[in-house]
Regions:
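Residue-level structural signal for beta-strand termini and adjacent loop
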Residues: 3-5, 54, 125
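Gly/Thr-rich phosphate-binding beta-strand-loop-beta motif of the actin/hexokinase/Hsp70
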Residues: 1, 102-119
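Short beta-strand-to-turn element immediately C-terminal to the catalytic PLP-Schiff-base lysine
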Residues: 87-88, 112-116, 120-122, 134-136
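A charged helix-plus-loop insertion that forms the helical arch/lid used to bind
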Residues: 47-59
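ATP-binding/phosphotransfer module of carbohydrate and carboxylate kinases, centering on a glycine-rich
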Residues: 1-32, 42-47, 63-75, 87-99, ...
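Structural signature of FAD isoalloxazine-binding scaffolds in flavoprotein oxidoreductases
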Residues: 126-130
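A cytosolic small-molecule/anion-sensing beta-strand core signal
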Residues: 31, 37, 115-116
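Short loop/edge segments at beta-strand edges and connector loops
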Residues: 77-81
Length: 220
């Protein structure tokens, strides 16, 4: 198990080179490579349709390129939140249910719809892309406010910083203050949780899954 800084990988060639290096330096028999990536993923064709974090990967048949660089080994590709959903359905909190919704709170909000214990991608691959659910709309400015804008961990830190009148604050510090009964942070956290609960309510009534699982860095 190892980690590589995403900032050190800034091009398609570097990305392929990095994965190939890990593969070729492995001292184990590798039967396949599974890639978990942000963005709208066409898992069947091994392509990232939409990705903001790594624009150089957009529209590329990533599985084919990596396979060629790694002795033609089998390579699979899926959205990171949907990978979390598969894990929950397989050996996690959703394993006792046929249908589930997985919500991953992080830099944005990831999601996965589990239908009959399988990932449901939808007709246009947007099923589970709950980060972009609209929570408010300003007609005068034509500005849209999404669920990610108000209920991601990034949004929580921003809301806490504004309430505390500081330039910035990280999530760990937010919860340290909350655990120490800081009234300002507790109020921020209360409203943050309410914003999450409202959309979970909407998701429940939209799909009626057996369970909704919440994960991501915030769950630590």
């Amino acid at each position: 198990k190892q980690a590589i800084s995403s900032t050190a990988v800034d091009s398609l060639d570097k990305f392929i080179e990095t994965v190939a290096k890990i593969y070729h330096e492995s001292n184990r028999k590798v039967e396949g490579i599974a890639l978990s990536c942000p963005g709208v993923i066409d898992a069947a064709n091994g392509t990232i349709k939409v990705v903001v974090a790594y624009p150089y990967l957009q529209g590329i048949c990533l599985t084919e390129l990596i396979s060629k660089a790694c002795d033609n080994i089998k390579v699979s590709l899926e959205n990171d939140a949907k990978c979390a959903g598969l894990a929950e359905a397989w050996i996690g909190s959703a394993q006792a249910y046929d249908d589930a919704i997985i919500v991953v709170l992080g830099t944005g909000i990831g999601g996965a719809i589990i239908k009959n214990k399988q990932i449901h991608h939808g007709a246009h691959l947007f099923a589970g892309e709950i980060s972009t659910l609209i929570v408010d709309y300003d007609k005068e400015t034509n500005q849209v406010l999404t669920w990610s804008d108000i209920a991601s961990t990034t949004a929580l830190c921003k809301r806490a910083a504004e309430a505390l009148a500081v330039t910035s604050i990280d999530g760990r510090r937010v919860f340290e203050l909350a655990n120490n009964a800081d009234e300002v942070v507790l109020e921020v956290l209360k409203n943050f949780c309410l914003d999450i609960a409202i959309q979970l309510y909407n998701l429940q009534y939209s799909y009626d899954p057996g369970v909704i699982c919440i994960g991501g860095g915030i769950s630590k």
